[in-house]
Amino acid sequence: QDLKDNSASTALNYEHKFAVSEMFTPVLNTGVYGEFKKRNFDARRFVYNMLGSGYDRFAEWDYSSVFSDANISTDRIYMKESTNKSDSYTSDNLLGAAYVAAKLNWGERLNANVGVRMEYYQLKLDGYESDGIKPVHLDQNATDFFPSVNIAYNLNEKHQVRLAYGRSVNRAEFREIVPYVYYDFALDANITGNVNLKNAYANNMDLRYEFYPTPGETVTIGGFYKRFDNPIEQTYMEAGSGLQYTYHNADHANAFGVELDIKKNLDFIGLKGLSFVFNGAYIHSRVYFAEGSFERDRAMQGQSPYLINTGLFYQNDNAGISASALYNRIGKRIETVGVPKQNPNDDIPDILSLIHISE
């Protein structure tokens, strides 16, 4: 494989502080950003082939020596190039953005960050379908606006409530779009892109309560809701023998849940230098499809119903000693979306990634 990526970017930011009064000191931020990426990709494919008496005598060979020098010849096993036009592509990616944001405060208790970002995005792709015959010429562009609001209210020095909203975009990566087929050793499957992928958009809302009992200690509990339009998911692709995966857009999806964060020093029980950290979340997600579709509502691909991260940390600066013990647990999730049929008994089921634990 020969992969060449060239990129260039530039940015300009400006900030202005206003002194309206002692209780109101807003800050205005604005700026622009530009980025250009160009990719050239070429790959060559080789396969082992067998001719002549090789087929007749293959069953007699010792499998441990199939590829020995004695068996590599034009009438036994030899390498043959199978490269076609779909193994090469070129792509250009242009992003231009401008933003304006304001930091607002009303006294010492209420603070707000509000802003909007405008982005122009263009993607060009030239290549071939996996058959190496049909050319692919892609030219996508979109102009989007992404507003955001973050409001924090300080109940007192130790307690704070935060409310946030933001809109974001998930643009398909090169590997998710280009029709190039590559083999994933971890999945034991071929993976190819989908030139018809659309950008995925998300509207995110969070409500959090934050408690700071002492410096360096936090307790945060919050709820969140996310709405996804055109979420990108990895799916099974019917392609004859062997496994092959690709990517597609679902119609829309929702996710909501609760999250708890704790950071607590254990000095109060005589364990100086030892701290406890916990992060846990429960997430309920659901993907929805158009009425009449063979697809059935399910959890989002790649989304676990719960996450647990916890650990103990020891720090002794005088002795130069630090140590930690960590525990992570992730609930089972859909690794790859299957293929639904008109008759549910003929479905190709989803592939699940079961519970993952690391210590």
Task: Identify what each model region corresponds to.
Residues Q1, F41-V47, K124-G132, F174-Y180, ...:
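Outer-membrane beta-barrel translocator domains and adjoining extracellular loop/strand segments
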Residues D2, N6, H16-F18, V32-N40, ...:
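Transmembrane beta-strands of outer-membrane beta-barrel pores
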Residues N13, K17-F18, M23-N156, Y182:
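Signature of Gram-negative outer-membrane beta-barrel scaffolds
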Residues K17-L28, A43, R109, N156-K158, ...:
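Short loop/turn motifs that connect adjacent beta-strands in outer-membrane beta-barrel proteins
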Residues P26-V32, A112-V116, P147, V161-L163, ...:
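Transmembrane beta-strands of outer-membrane beta-barrel proteins
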Residues T83-G96, Q140, V169-F228, E238-N265, ...:
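Outer-membrane beta-barrel signature, preferentially recognizing the C-terminal barrel domain
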Residues Y225-F228, Q244-V337:
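Gram-negative outer-membrane beta-barrel transporters
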Residues I355-E359:
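Conserved small/polar residues in nucleotide/adenosyl-binding loops
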